[in-house]
């Protein structure tokens, strides 16, 4: 027994074909939007690849770009099919291809749904990538004279200014690394010598941060050096006073930015997926309604359309049997090839 059977007359078939034609062209626009979102995400990831240890994954943006292009192609073709569906002469050339085309549409819908899920799952991989990338980027902040790293100072400074953040997890991360180049240290100074000697690794560590950590909204001039020394500044207590620095770490700021971007992209992709599923269901009804016409030459005759020719369990059983037959066919072919090669070996 057919699943979700619906009766169609000529008027209903015409309305269905026209509605699907319009929906397909809206879906082409949706495909362009998905393509644009994928391209934008790819650019945003590449833009900050230096603070992601150059190990960021482009699987999701590449997938979005791919399904965006495929959506435009499939829906343009479906729009043409719907336009030709009510002309018997034009429909005849599409008839042999409709079943395979619908199967491809179902597969495309599955892929689109998986891509939407991947958008929501990207956060986990980004978190570890950002943690390692930012840590290494901060280590190379001082290497302004080293080829291949001379740009890192500008990259980190611009990042902290743009995202209003400081350090990896917070401003105290800068206390643990030497971010001032040896080129700008006076090694004849007793203070510099003492600081370097007091460190096991011979690094010049200070309780200070780069200028890009300063919050311009603070009414007080920026205090970026001797942050933990209350006596070094007038009317200052670092434990109780709200520091005029960005308190948020850059990892959290970037993760929040990319998470919002990915959640928005995932939501849009899910909406497009629902739209595509609706179109595929509509195409199935149009296909079965046209196939079920008793007299194709008489456009006025009634017909029946359905979603599945049999019930869900029967359809699933038939699908499994066809897969088994395909597997057995491949096995027989392989055995035949082995038998043909055996005499040659002897």
From Swiss-Prot:
<dbReference type="GO" id="GO:0001917">
    <property type="term" value="C:photoreceptor inner segment"/>
</dbReference>
<keyword id="KW-0966">Cell projection</keyword>
<feature type="topological domain" description="Cytoplasmic">
    <location>
        <begin position="1"/>
        <end position="18"/>
    </location>
</feature>
<feature type="glycosylation site" description="N-linked (GlcNAc...) asparagine">
    <location>
        <position position="263"/>
    </location>
</feature>
<keyword id="KW-1133">Transmembrane helix</keyword>
<dbReference type="InterPro" id="IPR018498">
    <property type="entry name" value="Peripherin/rom-1_CS"/>
</dbReference>
<dbReference type="GO" id="GO:0051291">
    <property type="term" value="P:protein heterooligomerization"/>
</dbReference>
<feature type="transmembrane region" description="Helical">
    <location>
        <begin position="265"/>
        <end position="283"/>
    </location>
</feature>
<feature type="transmembrane region" description="Helical">
    <location>
        <begin position="63"/>
        <end position="79"/>
    </location>
</feature>
<keyword id="KW-1015">Disulfide bond</keyword>
<feature type="glycosylation site" description="N-linked (GlcNAc...) asparagine">
    <location>
        <position position="229"/>
    </location>
</feature>
<dbReference type="GO" id="GO:0042803">
    <property type="term" value="F:protein homodimerization activity"/>
</dbReference>
<dbReference type="GO" id="GO:0051260">
    <property type="term" value="P:protein homooligomerization"/>
</dbReference>
<comment type="similarity">
    <text>Belongs to the PRPH2/ROM1 family.</text>
</comment>
<feature type="region of interest" description="Interaction with MREG">
    <location>
        <begin position="341"/>
        <end position="346"/>
    </location>
</feature>
<feature type="topological domain" description="Cytoplasmic">
    <location>
        <begin position="284"/>
        <end position="346"/>
    </location>
</feature>
<keyword id="KW-0472">Membrane</keyword>
<dbReference type="GO" id="GO:0072659">
    <property type="term" value="P:protein localization to plasma membrane"/>
</dbReference>
<keyword id="KW-0325">Glycoprotein</keyword>
<keyword id="KW-0716">Sensory transduction</keyword>
<comment type="subunit">
    <text>Homodimer; disulfide-linked. Forms a homotetramer. Forms a heterotetramer with ROM1. Homotetramer and heterotetramer core complexes go on to form higher order complexes by formation of intermolecular disulfide bonds. Interacts with MREG. Interacts with STX3. Interacts with SNAP25.</text>
</comment>
<dbReference type="InterPro" id="IPR042026">
    <property type="entry name" value="Peripherin_LEL"/>
</dbReference>
<dbReference type="GO" id="GO:0051258">
    <property type="term" value="P:protein polymerization"/>
</dbReference>
<comment type="function">
    <text>Essential for retina photoreceptor outer segment disk morphogenesis, may also play a role with ROM1 in the maintenance of outer segment disk structure. Required for the maintenance of retinal outer nuclear layer thickness. Required for the correct development and organization of the photoreceptor inner segment.</text>
</comment>
<dbReference type="GO" id="GO:0060041">
    <property type="term" value="P:retina development in camera-type eye"/>
</dbReference>
<feature type="glycosylation site" description="N-linked (GlcNAc...) asparagine">
    <location>
        <position position="53"/>
    </location>
</feature>
<protein>
    <recommendedName>
        <fullName>Peripherin-2</fullName>
    </recommendedName>
</protein>
<dbReference type="GO" id="GO:0001750">
    <property type="term" value="C:photoreceptor outer segment"/>
</dbReference>
<feature type="transmembrane region" description="Helical">
    <location>
        <begin position="19"/>
        <end position="41"/>
    </location>
</feature>
<keyword id="KW-0130">Cell adhesion</keyword>
<feature type="transmembrane region" description="Helical">
    <location>
        <begin position="102"/>
        <end position="122"/>
    </location>
</feature>
<keyword id="KW-0812">Transmembrane</keyword>
<feature type="topological domain" description="Lumenal">
    <location>
        <begin position="123"/>
        <end position="264"/>
    </location>
</feature>
<keyword id="KW-0844">Vision</keyword>
<dbReference type="InterPro" id="IPR018499">
    <property type="entry name" value="Tetraspanin/Peripherin"/>
</dbReference>
<dbReference type="GO" id="GO:0051604">
    <property type="term" value="P:protein maturation"/>
</dbReference>
<feature type="topological domain" description="Lumenal">
    <location>
        <begin position="42"/>
        <end position="62"/>
    </location>
</feature>
<dbReference type="GO" id="GO:1903525">
    <property type="term" value="P:regulation of membrane tubulation"/>
</dbReference>
<dbReference type="InterPro" id="IPR000830">
    <property type="entry name" value="Peripherin/rom-1"/>
</dbReference>
<dbReference type="GO" id="GO:0032991">
    <property type="term" value="C:protein-containing complex"/>
</dbReference>
<dbReference type="Pfam" id="PF00335">
    <property type="entry name" value="Tetraspanin"/>
</dbReference>
<dbReference type="GO" id="GO:0050908">
    <property type="term" value="P:detection of light stimulus involved in visual perception"/>
</dbReference>
């Amino acid at each position: 027994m057919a699943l979700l059977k619906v009766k169609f007359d000529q008027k209903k078939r015409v309305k269905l074909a026209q509605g699907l034609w319009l929906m397909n062209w809206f879906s082409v626009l949706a495909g362009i939007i998905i393509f644009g979102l994928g391209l934008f995400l790819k650019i945003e990831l590449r833009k900050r690849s230096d603070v992601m240890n150059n190990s960021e994954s482009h699987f999701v943006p590449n997938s979005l770009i791919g399904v965006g292009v495929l959506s435009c192609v499939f829906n343009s073709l479906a729009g043409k099919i719907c336009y030709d569906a009510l002309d018997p002469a034009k429909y005849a050339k599409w008839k042999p291809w409709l079943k395979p085309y619908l199967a491809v549409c179902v597969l495309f819908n599955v892929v689109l749904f998986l891509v939407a899920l991947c958008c929501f799952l990207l956060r986990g991989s980004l978190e570890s990538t950002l943690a390692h990338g930012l840590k290494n980027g901060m280590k190379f902040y001082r290497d302004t004279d080293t080829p291949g790293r001379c740009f890192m100072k500008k990259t980190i400074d611009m990042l902290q200014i743009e995202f209003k953040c400081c350090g990896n997890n917070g401003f105290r991360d800068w206390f643990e690394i030497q971010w001032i180049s040896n080129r700008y240290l006076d090694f004849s100074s007793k203070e510099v010598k003492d600081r370097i000697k007091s460190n096991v690794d011979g690094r010049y560590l200070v309780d200070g941060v780069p200028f890009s950590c300063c919050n311009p909204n603070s009414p007080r001039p920026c205090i970026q050096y001797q942050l933990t020394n209350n006596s070094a500044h007038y009317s200052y207590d670092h434990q109780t006073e709200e520091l005029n620095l960005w308190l948020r770490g850059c990892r959290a700021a970037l993760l929040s930015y990319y998470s919002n971007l990915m959640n928005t992209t995932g939501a849009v992709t899910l909406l497009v997926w629902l739209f595509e599923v609706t179109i595929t269901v509509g195409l199935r009804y149009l296909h079965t309604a046209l196939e079920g016409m008793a007299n194709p030459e008489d456009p006025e005759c009634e017909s029946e359309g359905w979603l599945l020719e049999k019930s869900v369990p029967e359809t699933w059983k038939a699908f499994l049997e066809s897969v088994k037959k395909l597997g057995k066919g491949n096995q027989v072919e392989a055995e035949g090839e082995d038998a043909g090669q055996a005499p040659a070996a002897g």
